Amino acid sequence: MQQQEQQQGGMKVKVQRFGSYLSGMIMPNIGAFIAWGIITALFIPAGWFPNEQLNTLVSPMITYLLPLLIAYTGGKMIYDHRGGVVGATAAIGVIVGSDIPMFLGAMIMGPLGGYLIKQTDKLFKDKVKQGFEMLINNFTAGIVGAALTILAFYAIGPVVLTLNKLLAAGVEVIVHANLLPVASVFVEPAKVLFLNNAINHGILSPIGIEQASQTGKSILFLVEANPGPGLGILLAYMFFGKGSSKSTAPGAAIIHFFGGIHEIYFPYILMKPALILAAIAGGASGLLTFTIFNAGLVAAASPGSIIALMAMTPRGGYFGVLAGVLVAAAVSFIVSAVILKSSKASEEDLAAATEKMQSMKGKKSQAAAALEAEQAKAEEASELSPESVNKIIFACDAGMGSSAMGASILRNKVKKAELDISVTNTAINNLPSDADIVITHKDLTDRAKAKLPNATHISVDNFLNSPKYDELIEKLKK
C-alpha cells in the first residue's frame, strides 16, 4: 500500500514537472503574446482602428517572433543561453518550412537544440587544446544549429505540420459538434492538481494562436482562463461557508476575479472535494455559452482576470465573453450553495484541508501525516536565525501568481519584525541555489525538494492564510 502511494506521488510529480516544462516555454513570453494580441485587436481590418501599415506587423510577429521566443526559452531551460541560441536556430527550419505559425514545432526544436548542444559540449569537455576554446565553442554551436535547421526543414517540419493540422481539425470538429463543454470534465480537476498553466499555455494557447491568426479569435483561450467557475465557488463560501473560509472568501474572490490568480480558490475546493462538481458545471455551462455566442479572444488572457479577458476580446465580442463568465459564475454558485448547505459535516478550516488535499492528489492521509511529522522534525532540528537566513523564496508552478501573493504577505511581516531578510518569489524550475528557506504549497513541495534539497522547506495549505508565517517570524526573531 505504501509503495503504491509512493508510486502515485511520484507519477503526480512527474506529470506536474512535464506540465510545468510545457508552460515554462510560454509563460516567460506572455508579454510578447499580449503585445501581438493588442496590435491584432486594434489594427487588423476588423479591429478598432484599422491601419493598413500597422497591420503588416501582425503576420511577421506570429510567424517568426513568437515561435522563436518559445524555441529560445525551451533551449535555455535545457542549457542556458547557449542552448537557447541553438534551439532558436533549429526552430527556424520548421518555421520557414511550413505555411502556418509553428508553435508546436518551436516547442519541439527548442529543447531538442538545447539538449544536443549540451551533449556535444560534454563530448568535447577536457579535450580542447588551450587557446582553441572559443573556436570550438562557436563552431560546435554553429554546426549543430545548421544541421538541426536543415533536418527540421526537410524531415521534422513536415511531420509537425501534419500533426498540427490534425490537432486543428480535431478541435474544429469538437467545436462545431458543440462538444467543447465536455472538456471541463478534464480541465477543472486538472486545474486543482496545479496543471492549470500547463493546460492553458502548454496545450491550448499554441493551438488557439493558430486559430486566431486565421479567424481573428479563438474560443480555446477561454477554456481555462474563465474566472466564472472559481468566482461562483468563492461567492458560495461568502454566503454559506463557516469559520475562516467564510471570512477569507471575499478577499479571495476579488483577487481571483480581478487579479486573475486562479490558484487562490483551489484550497476551497480541496476542503470540500464535492465542489469540483460545481467547477465542472460552471466551466461546462460557460463554454456552452461561449459556443452559442461564437465568443473568443484574440490572444491568451494571462492572468485569467476579467480585466485581461476584456482586453483580449475582439471588437463586437464583449457580450458573448461576459455572458459566458456570468453564466459560469451563476451555475457554479448554485451548485456550490447546494453542496455547502446540504453538507452535514462541520466546515473545515482552511488550514485543516491537508488530508483531503492528499486524497484528491493521489496520497493517503497516513502519508500526509508522515510527511508532516518529517517536516516538523526537520524544522525543529534546523536552528533558524537572522544570521543563518538571508533569502526566503516563495515558489509555485509559474512563479507569478500565488507565490507572489505569499511573498508579499511575508515580506510585510519581515519588515514589521525589522529583519534584514530578502523575500522573493519564483517558479520552482528557477529556484536559486542560494535560497535558505523555500515556501511552497504542500502539493508542490516534493518538486521543490528535488530541485533544492539543501534548503529548509516549509509547506503551506494556502499562501494567503497560513499560521506558519507567524511561526517562522517568531523563530527568526529568537
From Swiss-Prot:
It is found in: Cell membrane. Residues 390-478 form the PTS EIIB type-2 domain. GO terms for biological process: phosphoenolpyruvate-dependent sugar phosphotransferase system. It catalyses: D-mannitol(out) + N(pros)-phospho-L-histidyl-[protein] = D-mannitol 1-phosphate(in) + L-histidyl-[protein]. The chain crosses the membrane at residues 30-51, 56-76, 140-161, 171-191, 279-298, 319-340. Keywords: Cell membrane, Kinase, Membrane, Phosphoprotein, Phosphotransferase system, Sugar transport, Transferase, Transmembrane, Transmembrane helix, Transport. It is an enzyme of class 2 (transferase). Its main location: membrane. This is PTS system mannitol-specific EIICB component. The lineage of its organism: Bacteria, Bacillati, Bacillota, Bacilli, Bacillales.
